[in-house]
């Protein structure tokens, strides 16, 4: 079977119905591609590098990304369902307004990434890095956070009620002046001083 690059698959999709299905892409280096509004289903991306690519309003169904690097990429208003990102680097990428449902982010990096007004529905973060990420005004429904680093992350106007952060690093997180985002969140005794500092309580 002939191997097709992502650029070739994208060009073919643009000529037809903006639809990519059952694709397998390995070691592709893609720069400056406009994959906006593309619909990708049941496809695998492995050891691929995407630089300054646009995935605005793109949809990914049952897609797997392994050991991929996304640099300067925009996923604004993109949709992910039953997707898995494993050992991927998405530092500084823009996921504003994106929706993720029934998806897994495993051992992946999202440092400085922006998820402003994004939606996570039954999304699992497992051993991932969200240091200094912008997780503002998000809507979270039954997410699972496992050993995830949120150091310096901004949760402004993102309600965390009912969420379990016991397994995570939350040093230096940012919330609103009222700290309303933290009401009902589950933390450990070791994490309590971090939250106390946010609400102006001094522990002696």
Question: What are these language model-derived features?
Answer:
Residues 2-204:
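Tandem repeat scaffolds
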